[in-house]
């Protein structure tokens, strides 16, 4: 009966106690010590630089807006000339790029046709060179055989004459 009153070992829950769990409120989120001297020097150095860059960005924005305000009426006044000129220039650039693309297409087609003819005849540069080497080897072999037979026949004739003289 004593076992029923005591909790079983697998039902024991352990809750570790953290000493600074909820103490301090917002202060616990902040670091305990202040910034280091290198961090302070970095901030002191970067503040004027970032301020200068921000000022330059603002000046650039104002200059762009003023330029747009001045140029818009000029574009409206000269649009009967500028629009056809822009269309003409765009057409010329497109024609130039198209002619280059057609030239490359023609060259690649010609290369493909030549390669297909080479494959049809079976004589590519490598096959032609191999065949030439094989023919040269056969020619040298035949000439060597003929020279050996000539030496043999000369030796036989010399041997007959040597035996006839003695």
UniProtKB/Swiss-Prot annotation:
The modification N-acetylalanine is found at residue 2. The keyword tRNA-binding does not apply. Residues 1-27 are annotated as: Disordered. Keywords: Acetylation, Allergen, Lipid droplet, Membrane, Transmembrane, Transmembrane helix. It comes from the Eukaryota. The chain crosses the membrane at residues 40-60, 73-93, 94-114. Its main location: other. May have a structural role to stabilize the lipid body during desiccation of the seed by preventing coalescence of the oil. Probably interacts with both lipid and phospholipid moieties of lipid bodies. May also provide recognition signals for specific lipase anchorage in lipolysis during seedling growth. This is Oleosin H1. It comes from Sesamum indicum.
């Amino acid at each position: 009966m004593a076992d029923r009153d005591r909790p079983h070992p697998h039902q024991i829950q352990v809750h570790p106690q953290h000493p600074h769990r909820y103490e301090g409120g917002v202060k616990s989120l902040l670091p305990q010590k202040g910034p280091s001297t290198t961090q302070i020097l970095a901030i002191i150095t970067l503040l004027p630089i970032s301020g200068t860059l921000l000022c330059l960005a603002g000046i650039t924005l104002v200059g762009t807006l003023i330029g747009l305000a001045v140029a818009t009426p000029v574009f409206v006044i000269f649009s009967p000339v500028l629009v056809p000129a822009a269309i003409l220039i765009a057409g010329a650039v497109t024609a130039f790029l198209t002619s280059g693309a057609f030239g490359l297409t023609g060259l690649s087609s010609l290369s493909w046709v030549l390669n297909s003819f080479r494959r049809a005849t079976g004589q590519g540069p490598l096959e032609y060179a191999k065949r030439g080497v094989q023919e040269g080897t056969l020619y040298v072999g035949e000439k060597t055989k003929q020279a050996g037979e000539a030496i043999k026949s000369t030796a036989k004739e010399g041997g007959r004459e040597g035996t006839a003289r003695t």
